[in-house]
């Protein structure tokens, strides 16, 4: 696994996979840099290909401050290390 750091300003439009760009993993507080585990991007790409539908990342990398502002978020969340993402698959309902 390779954890990489990206600049939102410089690398935001960069494709990590055919369907995911760096900016989609950005912390919602707009901070820079963004950390993304390459394996996470590849896994999300595989999910998108499996369902054949767009996948929207609702939470990717989080700074410690942003993570602390989320009710119920673990202080040891893998989001802090670019190893987790919350997402939804368009058109797919979760039972």
Task: Annotate each predicted stretch with a short phrase.
Residues 2-95:
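Cell-envelope/glycan interface and biosynthesis
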């Amino acid at each position: 696994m390779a954890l990489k750091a990206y600049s939102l300003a410089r690398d935001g439009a960069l494709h990590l996979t055919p369907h995911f760009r760096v900016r989609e993993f950005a912390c919602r507080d707009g901070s820079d840099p963004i950390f993304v585990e390459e394996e996470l991007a590849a896994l999300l790409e595989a999910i998108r290909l499996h369902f054949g539908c767009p996948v929207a990342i609702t939470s990717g990398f989080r700074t410690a401050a942003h993570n602390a502002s989320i009710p119920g978020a673990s202080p040891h969340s893998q989001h802090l290390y670019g190893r987790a993402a919350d997402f939804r698959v368009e058109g797919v309902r979760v039972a």
